[in-house]
Amino acid sequence: MGKISLMLRQIVCLPIKMYQYFISPLITPCCRYYPSCSEYADSAIKHYGVIKGLLMALNRLSRCHPWSKGGYDPLFPNDKN
């Protein structure tokens, strides 16, 4: 992985980390999935890169709503809880 790619991933993940540290502790946990959507997005971007990771995160966020069943939704399908 090149330095530019690594820096880009860190820059894109910065707002996620800021949300996790500053906003998330102040609100009631409401994510219907495990791992949480912010953890999922951070991991997806770090593992798959910015473009595919963001697309995966957006897909996940679109499924996280009050009418969603939720549950265990790992980044890697073969992960066991």
Curated annotation (Swiss-Prot):
Keywords: Cell inner membrane, Cell membrane, Membrane. Signal peptide: none annotated. Its main location: membrane. It is found in: Cell inner membrane. It comes from the Bacteria. It is a peripheral membrane protein. The keyword Coiled coil does not apply. GO terms for cellular component: plasma membrane. Could be involved in insertion of integral membrane proteins into the membrane. Belongs to the UPF0161 family. This is Putative membrane protein insertion efficiency factor.
